A protein has these predicted regions:
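Short, polar/charged, Gly/Pro-enriched helix-capping and turn/loop motifs at alpha-helix termini
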Residues: 2-6, 66, 116
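Anionic-ligand binding region
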Residues: 10-11
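Residues in the helix-turn-helix
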Residues: 51, 100-101
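Short, solvent-exposed alpha-helical "recognition" segments
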Residues: 62-64, 111-114
Length: 126
């Protein structure tokens, strides 16, 4: 582990306030626990699916799925560092659904398990 937290880039679109995607990104962040399907996101943004995918990628540098995974991982990491919420609840709250899914994606991105990360970087003794 080395005792150093791994960096997860926090994707922020260019011209966030003026961009039509800003409110949509806020909505997605506030509803991480929900499924976000491309047709629904495009409709919410008032765009065709093709235009939505192009604009989303231009604004964030990622596909919606990769952006959402990144945001979910950042939120999970924040919970692990600052709370004693169970891994199960973190998985539900951040949209991973199950602890197994959270562990898989967390290990893939961070190189460690959520439990080991919490033991190393957590600020609250669980």
């Amino acid at each position: 582990d080395g005792g150093q937290a791994q960096f997860i880039e926090r994707s922020v679109p260019t011209d966030y306030e003026s961009d039509r995607l800003g409110p949509l990104l806020d909505h997605m962040r506030k509803h991480l626990h929900q499924e976000h399907r491309i047709p629904d996101l495009a409709r919410r943004a008032g765009m065709s699916e093709r235009t939505f995918l192009r604009r989303f990628s231009e604004a964030t540098g990622k596909t919606p799925a990769k952006w959402l995974l990144n945001v979910r991982l950042c939120e999970a990491r924040d919970h692990l560092e600052t709370s004693d919420i169970s891994i199960e609840r973190i998985a539900e709250h951040t949209g991973f659904g199950t602890p197994t899914n959270l562990r898989h994606h967390f290990r893939e991105q961070m190189g460690t398990t959520p439990t080991a990360y919490r033991q190393t970087f957590g600020r609250i003794s669980a």
